[in-house]
Regions:
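Plant-biased, solvent-exposed loop and capping regions
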Residues: 1-383, 393-400
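Regulatory modules of eukaryotic transcription factors, especially in plants
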Residues: 387-391
Length: 400
């Protein structure tokens, strides 16, 4: 009887005291007889999707409904098939993690019955279909990760009901439509990652109410919109902001320089215009600033210290009308791919020509006056020696 009083069963290289995975491991139904089981984990056990594919048993999960609090299948490429509908009977579950397996099909709507869930991770599989609206009732949820699947359809409006949520990652799917205004209810959210989807309809002002956000990643979506439409000082906790390749237009607001905790700012591959405020270079924590492939113009008046600190993590190339002032930047810190301001280059060239011309006139006068070449200074360079040789030849021709 003591065997059946097992509360934790970890199989695979999870902890030092975990059970090892047997070769060609099968999922035994005896597991469902462990009526006191609270934790069940399989890590890197089912690894051969072609030679030895394994499906999660579709029945008997209700036998663990009164005890199981954590169920995890991680890194099992040989684990195939669908999520069993009977998972919906595991009403005491606090953590459901199905990460990087070979699972397919739609996500069962009755997962929304697991109202005690604090962590729901279904990332790195091949799930399809829409995100169930029923997930909006998971009021205790803290971690919500459905990334790296093939989910489609709009973002559910019920997302706004997840008021306890800390991290929401729906990246790398095929989600489309607009960003629902209901996300403004997620006051505790610290991470929102929606990159690599098909979300559109512009930046929503709902972000302004999400004052706890530390990471906002929307890159590679046809969102569109204007940075000027948001009051960036409300997002003062941002550490990572990636809005690359989302179809932005308009100018980069000076108010973004108030994001004092910002370490990464990605605005590349958009249609941004106008000049850059020098205040962007005063962001105290920034270590990467990507502005390349836009239509920014004017002088890049960032101090030399900024380029020394950030180096190649400052990207501003492919802005044809953007330039840097020659006098403000040392040769070793020239921003990569940005040209020097042409007016300054022209002035420098003009000054150089003037000095050279004046130098030639003075040297020629000394040469003609002396006739004995005693006034000539040979430190002027080899090109001047050539000129002297030419003049000597002309002089001799006149008297021979």
């Amino acid at each position: 009887d003591g065997l059946w009083y097992v509360t934790t069963l970890n199989i695979g290289p999870i902890h030092d005291n975990s059970l090892g995975c047997a070769k060609n491991l099968e999922f035994r139904t005896q597991v469902f007889e462990l009526k006191h089981l609270k934790t069940l984990s399989f890590f890197n056990c089912f690894v051969s999707p072609k030679r030895h594919p394994i499906a999660i048993p579709s029945n008997s999960w209700d036998k663990l409904g009164g005890s199981l609090e954590s169920l995890e299948f991680r890194s099992n490429p040989g684990l195939i098939g669908k999520i069993p509908v009977s998972f919906g009977s595991l009403v005491k579950l606090k953590s459901l993690v199905l990460l990087e397996n070979g699972l397919t099909g739609n996500i069962p709507t009755n997962i929304g019955n697991l109202i005690n869930l604090k962590r729901l991770v279904l990332a790195g599989n091949r799930f399809v279909g829409w995100i169930p609206d029923s997930f909006g009732g998971l009021n205790e949820l803290l971690i919500y990760d459905l990334s790296r699947n093939t989910l489609s359809g709009p973002l559910p409006l019920t997302l706004g009901g997840l008021t306890s949520l800390l991290k929401l990652d729906l990246s790398n799917n095929q989600l489309e439509g607009m960003l629902p205004s209901e996300i403004s209810n997620l006051k505790n959210l610290t991470l929102l990652d929606l990159r690599n989807n098909k979300i559109s309809s512009g930046l929503t002002k709902s972000f302004q109410g999400m004052c706890s956000l530390e990471e906002l990643v929307l890159s590679n979506n046809p969102i569109g919109g204007d940075l000027m439409s948001l009051e960036w000082h409300n997002l003062h906790n941002l550490v990572i902001l990636d809005l690359s390749n989302i179809g932005l237009t308009g100018e980069i607001p000076e108010s973004m320089s108030k994001l004092k905790r910002l370490r990464f700012l990605g605005l590349s591959d958009n249609n941004l215009t106008g000049t850059l405020s020098p205040k962007l270079a005063t962001l105290p924590c920034v270590s990467a600033l990507y502005l390349n492939a836009n239509n920014l113009t004017g002088e890049l008046n960032f101090p030399d210290d900024f380029y020394r600190e950030v180096g190649r993590r400052f990207r501003a190339w492919n802005n044809p009308n953007l330039c840097y002032p020659v006098g403000l930047v040392s040769a070793s810190h020239v921003p990569y791919g940005v040209k020097p301001c042409q007016q300054q280059v022209t002035l420098l060239e003009h000054d150089l020509r003037t000095k050279l011309a004046n130098g030639n006139m003075n040297q020629n006068s000394q040469f003609v006056a002396s006739l004995g070449f005693t006034s000539y200074g040979f430190g002027a360079g080899i090109w001047w020696v050539s000129l002297v040789e030419m003049l000597i030849g002309l002089f001799l021709n006149c008297f021979l």
